[in-house]
UniProtKB/Swiss-Prot annotation:
WD repeats lie at residues 839-869, 881-911, 923-953, 965-995, 1007-1037, 1049-1079, 1091-1121, 1133-1163, 1175-1205, 1217-1247. Pfam families: Beta-prop_WDR3_1st, GPIID_WHD, HET, NPHP3_N, WD40. Gene3D superfamilies: P-loop containing nucleotide triphosphate hydrolases, YVTN repeat-like/Quinoprotein amine dehydrogenase. Transmembrane segments: none annotated. GTP binds at G300, D301, P302, G303, K304, G305, K306, T307. Residues 294-629 form the NACHT domain. It comes from Podospora anserina. The lineage of its organism: Eukaryota, Fungi, Dikarya, Ascomycota, Pezizomycotina. Responsible for vegetative incompatibility through specific interactions with different alleles of the unlinked gene, het-c. This is Vegetative incompatibility protein HET-E-1.
Amino acid sequence: MRLLERDDAGEIRPTKDLPSGKIPPYAILSHTWGPDEEEVSYKDLKDGRAVSKLGYNKIRFCADQAWRDGRKFFWVDTCCIDKSNSTELQEAINSMFRWYRDAAKCYVYLTDVSTDKRDADGDPSWKWAFQKCKWFTRGWTLQELIAPTSVEFFSREKARIGDRNSLERMIHDVTGIPLEALRGSPLSDFSVHDRMAWMKQRNTTREEDMAYSLFGIFDVHLPLIYGEGKEKALERLREKIGKDDGCLADLRVTDPRHDKKRIEAAKGGLLKDSYCWVLSNVQFQQWHDGDDQRLLWINGDPGKGKTMLLCGIIDELKKSTPPGLLSFFFCQATDSRINNATAVLRGLIYLLVSQQPALISHVRRPYDHAGKKMFEGPNVWIVLCEIFTSILQDPGLRMTYLIIDALDECVTDLPQLLELITRTSCTSSPIKWIVSSRNWPDIEEQLETATQKARLSLELNAESISTAVNAFIQNRIDQLAPKTKHDANMIGKIRDYLHSHANGTFLWVALVCQALADPKVKKRHILAKLQTFPRGLDSLYARMLEQIGHSEDAELCKQILAVAAAVRRPISLDELASLVEMPDDVSDDPESLEEIVKLCGSFLIIRERTVYFVHQSAKDFLLGTASDKASNKASQEAFELVFPTGIEDVSYIIFWRSLNVMSQKLRRDIYCLNAPGFLIDNVRVPDPDPLATVRYSCIYWIDHLRDLVSSTSSKWVHLLQDDGDIHRFLTTKYLYWLEALSLLRALPEGINAIRQLESLLGHTIRGRLIAIVRDGYRFALSYRMIIEKAPLQAYTSALVFAPTDSMIKKIFKKEEPGWISTISVVEAEWNACTQTLEGHGSSVLSVAFSADGQRVASGSDDKTIKIWDTASGTGTQTLEGHGGSVWSVAFSPDRERVASGSDDKTIKIWDAASGTCTQTLEGHGGRVQSVAFSPDGQRVASGSDDHTIKIWDAASGTCTQTLEGHGSSVLSVAFSPDGQRVASGSGDKTIKIWDTASGTCTQTLEGHGGSVWSVAFSPDGQRVASGSDDKTIKIWDTASGTCTQTLEGHGGWVQSVVFSPDGQRVASGSDDHTIKIWDAVSGTCTQTLEGHGDSVWSVAFSPDGQRVASGSIDGTIKIWDAASGTCTQTLEGHGGWVHSVAFSPDGQRVASGSIDGTIKIWDAASGTCTQTLEGHGGWVQSVAFSPDGQRVASGSSDKTIKIWDTASGTCTQTLEGHGGWVQSVAFSPDGQRVASGSSDNTIKIWDTASGTCTQTLNVGSTATCLSFDYTNAYINTNIGRIQIATATMESLNQLSSPVCYSYGLGQDHRWITCNNQNVLWLPPEYHTSAFTMQGRKIVLGSYSGRIIIFLFSRDV
């Protein structure tokens, strides 16, 4: 930033560029521009021409006015920005709002407002001129009005006419800007629409500035692109705001501002007299005013008013001048949303970004890679810490106050949170912390490590607290008096009793006054009632529990208290009614239920129909963990009263009643979605919600079972036996439960729960139940992705594609869709593949497990790396930054980093938690084929196409060794277990062993007949396994260099090898689409894992529907029995992939089209080729016989259709007109027309006699499968059944989306559709490369080589 400086003599000169943090107090000028040639530029100042210009008059005014206000520095936009420097101009416009905001004063010089003129009555006429002045119509002056803390207005005569405060009503009337905005409320309090509307009556010289002048209002930074136009500039601004808002919405777990309002309302409002004492407290003032104390710990016993004290401090800090950032969070142990360190950090970041939106860049950086999932999973704390630390180091960060209430109620990861607080409180950033908690030694111990701290003990400020409590007592009595109609004498006695017994505890006063306000307490009994309340919070709890025990509903109240204390989150009244055995007259009457809960009012409170404890101390008291456990007998007695048979019995009740209510309530399609493909994003919760009573139970029932199993009780044993309650639930309601979990957006939690159940059973009883649980876990895991997206697919896709021997499939067979008559070739058992992870946009070239097996990294041809959670199968991170395909990935041994090697010749080191790139290692001269971490994680080895191996220091990124000696690309590298050696495999057919200290090659292992694609050390380092494109694996002795085993059996290149952890087995992966497991000692293959195969590119039915023909990448055509799914013929002869196959009408011949450019005619019985038709200039994508079998139509990548005479093999017609590859062709039943589908997204109808195109249908996607129906009125396609209208060619050419009927294939080939609606999701292994249909029969050919046949009995 560059300022102007006025010296004592009145001379004005520009300063040098001032860095952030070194800028002195300054004033700033706001004005309207005159003619460009009369405004003073930066160049004019430098050249000495400024004084001669008219615009200098404004600069002189600002200098003199600032001098009068005690400031010699000031800023004027015309001459403090070098507009000839585009970089400086960009930075200036993006910083303008901040410069106005940080100015000590803003002077608005209005050349069209005069204070010398008078109206007819002799009064000054400037008010009328002020309201009509040009300044209010300019775009850039909007931020100049709003941003500064002080804005003063001056007339043409340089006379002060008022400031923003004194003129606010007039300014509001002119501009329509709310008074709150003019008074300094955060702009984030106003909607995007409202802020945009403030520009309505304004204009700018350059049209793009209508958007650019709003950058500061929304605190966004975007590049300036003059020439793009106003609409494009506004579109970019809106897009940026939209993406930022989406990120902020995903970050938000709660809005602490709303929590503050809720807390204050629940406690009867914030009373200033109850907290104002702290403003004059020495410790608080030292923290607030000084620089040497950046952390203030406010500590005190329960009920001492810590939370309301912090609410008051927050309100006072909001009034700070200049305004800073204020972020706060209220922990609450009973609410799982806000009782953990992650939630605290999300809340603090949320408020910081809400107030200073430019800080969103620190969140967007990792968020743009990972999306919403960044805020989930085991690494979220690390990610949030990095974001938070980055925000605190932002050079544009204003003075920031961070406040956390009730650290003792942060029940998860408190030590991590305390470490973060102490660490950041010691930095030089402009931040200060206030935290509050009970007097817990472990909190004190960790906060003691902070070097710049202060402590404010409420017990040591007893006199101040007592005064504040007395004010609180008076406030409560003032509220009580009108309700109870007590006279002054009685009020005085109540006040005296409260004063003498409160013991400095706000909560004690609140609970007693609440009890006295009960309408059931008679006026004449009030003093007697008062006398029953003893001193001290725990004593009061004990007395109130005793009173509950004497009520008519004592047992019911105790049950409610027990359940409320045992559940894992606050529960709704509906959920409570399902977990506690209620009398009939209560369970069916919401008002009666609420009345019963209010009987527990000393302990519980109802907010928005959810039951909470009035205070954490109340819950602690009931659980026997009150503040003084050593001597507090009352708390232990309370525990024995509420949990007479132990808390495990309450866990049992919650578990059993959860199972019972789920069994009663859960049913298929509980939200009446009806459509099988109804997506979760479109679901709206019905009113009333049929899941209202079971929401808690669905998610937590297994947690309570686990509590029971881990206790000393033996009640759980029968639950885990065959034919018990759990067994019955799973065999009758399991699918309904999965559907409900999906609707509740809690399916991952459900999968983890069923895994816990499997673990519980695995250590106890064996039988049918454990088998069902294991199968259920596999079922849920396999189809998690689709059930999560479309809940009703639990009954369609999941049941249809589950193996035939799956117990869940057998048990729920009655739930299978009735509209599917038969389906062929579904596997009998769950295969070895437990998960398929989808998300990459291209081939996956490398995968690696983390050391703990909980994550997988994958590198892809799409230039990205993805991190996956292996338990749930969800992608947690997407790492972007490489400029080419990612050929290799590796986790560091500590699981915190990922290394990747790419086509772009670099290795990148990534933080696995945040997804940020921490190092880019450059130096290779070719593609990086392989990367590996050393066992200690301090080094990375890389192998490249440049024939070298490089060893890198992982911390500094420097190359410490370059190992040369291979004669071709280095395709694989591996460290030995001790890190002292590296093995490398190369395209020169050798393996080399290298000493990492000296960089010398100690062994060259020769014997392979092809490139060595993979090498691996055994765990003891004494052997190396190698895989080659000679189709073998070799085991080598590293000491002697001899080959001890050659493992043969693969039918293709061996591209990956690895030893088992015990060194006894070797696994190998090959491009023959198999994985083999070998005995490393004997060399025998013990297992072959199959599941991949060559892609099927085309399928066709025989006319009688009894056979199916398929064409494959392997160049063959296979004939299949459609009933049994067995292959009856293999036809070989094409020189490339077979893209299309078709039966002749009599079923005796098959036509096939290939990428070799030919069509072949085959005898279906003998398998011999009878004709080869040549003439296309590209791949033959589709073939079809005419109804009489005498002609064949073919469609090609050369964009033409050809008609062939099958007898002579001659081409009789070439049809041209498509703008893309012709993917499908079909004859009409009368043979007079041909339909063709193309990648240009059209279907054309051709007259076969003349060769002319008679109709063009714009269908919006590629029709890869076509056939006419028998009436000639419809065309059956992969996207559905399309009606052919009898209209002119011109009108049909304009048809953009014909109506599709019956069954088809979705545009993304992942859904089977019915009448254009998604009905059946296809799992990844069935993703379709070829499709054909005959009536209601559909055949799919998949990329994995599978053929699957569906017969649909009716429409959905």
